[in-house]
């Protein structure tokens, strides 16, 4: 068995056992989940890194979603995923209580999952650092406001392990899950590529998360702040896995530094000229 196959097997087995043991913990049958550890420090990730898309690609895709007569109803949600970096399971788990429009805060404290059996479960965030409060930008605030105001009122208000008032629900009133959005993104990208000659790469909810992190890194967000926003327990995960800065970014940084140096020289030159002028005036006096 290859290293990649071993890694995938371990991840698959843990993915099955972790939620099962978590249910035992929730039912007070166990004190601690033995599979609650993070794989980052246990196995080396040999899979190909899922790349972020560029800001230009993101904007083109969002415009397509906004203007398309089929996918326009998903625009607010997709915009939020691109501009908050939330995990899709965190987004699907959001309830009305988690969205503070008055103070413009998103309270992320759980995630929703659905098993093959069809049973729904409310789980803790992926790591303890995943429990966090995210501030809303003006645009993200407007997206959430629209979702809340247009939330269907004719669907049943289901309760999952004490949680109710889910923001995004399916036709039966159940909270939507990651699989819903994986399929939507897949079909939306296919529709985009059927229309436009310049093809869009594969986009998933997780690509949205990668893209958000990379865009924040390009904007020179403080690394510790970015770690908090992403909900990572280790900053190395933030910087090594979720940032995809390349040659163009390096060129932009060199240009930026050159512009800063030129501006600094110009300021120094102005200051010298000012000092000379003042000295001349004093001599004249």
Where are these regions (language model features)?
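C-terminal secondary-structure termini that scaffold catalytic or DNA-interacting sites
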Residues: 103, 114-116, 120-131, 138-140, ...
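Gram-positive cell-envelope targeting signals
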Residues: 5, 52, 90-93, 176, ...
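Short, polar N-cap/turn motifs at the start of nucleic acid-interacting alpha helices
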Residues: 98-105, 221-241
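Conserved tyrosine-mediated DNA breakage-rejoining catalytic core shared by Y-recombinases
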Residues: 39-40, 93-153, 159
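Basic, Lys/Arg- and aromatic-enriched nucleic-acid-binding interface segment
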Residues: 4-7, 11-15, 26, 30-94, ...
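Catalytic-site neighborhood detector that most strongly recognizes the C-terminal catalytic loop/helix
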Residues: 44, 52, 111-114, 230-256
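Short, basic (Lys/Arg/His-rich) helix/loop patches that form interaction surfaces
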Residues: 3-7, 63-74, 134, 150-158, ...
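C-terminal flanking helix
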Residues: 18-21, 25, 246, 250
């Amino acid at each position: 068995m290859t290293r990649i196959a071993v890694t995938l097997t371990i991840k698959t087995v843990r993915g099955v056992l972790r939620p099962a043991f978590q249910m035992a913990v929730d039912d007070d049958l166990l004190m601690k989940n033995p599979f609650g550890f993070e794989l980052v420090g246990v196995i080396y990730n040999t899979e190909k890194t899922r790349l972020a898309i560029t800001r230009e690609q993101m904007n083109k895709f969002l415009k397509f979603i906004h203007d398309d007569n089929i996918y326009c109803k998903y625009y607010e949600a997709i915009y939020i995923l691109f501009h908050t970096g939330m995990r899709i399971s965190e987004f699907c788990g959001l309830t009305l209580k988690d969205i503070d429009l008055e103070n413009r805060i998103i309270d992320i404290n759980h995630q929703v999952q659905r098993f093959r059996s069809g049973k729904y479960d409310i789980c803790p965030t992926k790591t303890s650092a995943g429990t966090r409060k995210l501030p809303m930008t003006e645009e993200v605030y407007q997206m959430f406001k629209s979702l809340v105001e247009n939330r269907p009122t004719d669907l049943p208000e289901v309760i999952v392990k004490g949680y109710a008032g889910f923001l995004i629900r399916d036709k039966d009133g159940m909270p939507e899950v990651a699989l819903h959005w994986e399929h939507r993104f897949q079909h939306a990208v296919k529709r985009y590529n059927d229309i436009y000659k310049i093809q869009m790469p594969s986009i998933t909810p997780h690509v949205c998360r990668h893209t958000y992190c990379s865009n924040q890194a390009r904007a020179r967000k403080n690394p510790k702040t970015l770690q908090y926003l992403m909900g990572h327990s280790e900053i190395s995960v933030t910087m090594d896995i979720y940032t995809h800065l390349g040659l163009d970014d390096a060129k932009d940084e060199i240009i930026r530094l050159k512009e800063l140096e030129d501006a600094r020289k110009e300021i120094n030159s102005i200051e010298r000229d000012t000092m000379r002028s003042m000295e001349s005036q004093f001599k004249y006096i």
